[in-house]
Amino acid sequence: TDARATDGLTEALERASAFIEDGADITFVEAPLSIEEMCKIPVALNGTPQLVNLVVGGKTPILALDELGEMGFSLVLYANVALQAAVHGMQIALGQLKETGKMDQDGPLASFLERQRMVRKDHFDKLEQRYAF
């Protein structure tokens, strides 16, 4: 529930409790604003598995995975972390290219072989050979 933002933590916990009463296996109280609020959520919801969403630059404090587990969160979303890291890497690589006029092959780049592995190129080449006419 995103009720925390509009109606406060108490209302969000009441809604999550209602979802649990209706059979929810897990609940998600969006955007707790402090560690204190984060600690209250799993306790107030009597051990029902909880999801927490961590956004770099967001409202919820960023804590270590083990701390979140100790609090009672069983699923953690690291929203946008891969995208933000990729954008940062792109900015560095393209900034170097703009500044120097050449690619820095030893810079913040995955190797060509790593790129091919990540996109499963061999797998798709085999599919192409199998199904192409």
Task: For every predicted segment, state its role.
Residues 1-96, 130-133:
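Alpha/beta enzyme core
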Residues 83-133:
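Extended, intrinsically disordered, low-complexity segments
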